Structure formats: structure tokens, C-alpha cells
Amino acid sequence: MKSTLRISLKSGEKIFINGAVLRVDRKVALEFLNDVTFLLENHVLQPDQATTPLRQLYFIAQMILINPEGREQSTNMFRKSVSMLLNCFQHDEILAELKRIDGLVASGKAFEALKAIRGLYTIEEKILSNQEMTPATIEQIRKEIAPWR
């Protein structure tokens, strides 16, 4: 880490740091002085919110950060899911970004991958509302990822 990172949390807010879940009892500022893997509570997707292919991919990617003990299993599932999505999506921007996201996770940058996946949600909504991806394909993706929910 080239510089310190400062994060402000509100009373009752949670943060996931290196696999541990912390809840603060009052407004607090945290300053990270070295490299740390963290995820803010408002960026954590709950299983019942993983309702689209990209949200399911996000859920798996967040498990890489939240559950260090299961990192290898989560990473393997992530790679399998990306491969499946590359075969299902036909939108050039999503395909290019999925390849970049895969590279981010492979290089240990899962946090950056989460931000990139969130950036694709709007495009995915348009694709799904225009039925550019068949319901059968969406259902196939859901079945593949179901064990994670």
C-alpha cells in the first residue's frame, strides 16, 4: 500500500476485514496503514439478492474476500462462472469486461473486480429486459450457481 487508507463508519455499521466481521458501536474512523482486504457492509450482496447472472458472479467474488478459508473453492467457482457467462453473453462490452474481471481476480484484486461487476449491472438489466439472453440460459446459470446461495 503506497499510502494509508481512511474509512469512516457509522454506529452499528459492519465491515469485513481479512475475513473477520467487525461492527462498530459508534461513529468511528479507521485508518489502514498497510495492505488489507476489506469489504464495507453496503457492498455485501445477500444470497437472496443474487438474482441475475452478474449478481451471482458478484456474490461468488465477494466470497473470495469474506471467506479466506474458502478462497480456493470460491476462486474455482468464480472461474467456472466467468467461463459460462462468456459463452452466454453476446454484448461486446460485457464480454471484454468479464475477461478483465477474470484477470483482476486471477491477480488477487477481487475488490476491484467487485467494482467492475457492479458497473455492468445497468447493461445487464437492459439485456435481460430485452430478452437478449434466453430464459433457459438464465435458468442454466442459476442452477450452476445455486449451491452458493
Swiss-Prot record:
InterPro entries: Flagellum_FlbT. One of its GO terms (biological process) is mRNA catabolic process. Keywords: Bacterial flagellum biogenesis, Repressor, RNA-binding. GO terms for molecular function: mRNA 5'-UTR binding. It comes from the Bacteria. It holds the Pfam family FlbT. Belongs to the FlbT family. Has a post-transcriptional repressor function in flagellum biogenesis. Associates with the 5'-UTR of fljK mRNA and promotes its degradation. This is Probable flagellum biosynthesis repressor protein FlbT. It comes from Agrobacterium fabrum (strain C58 / ATCC 33970).
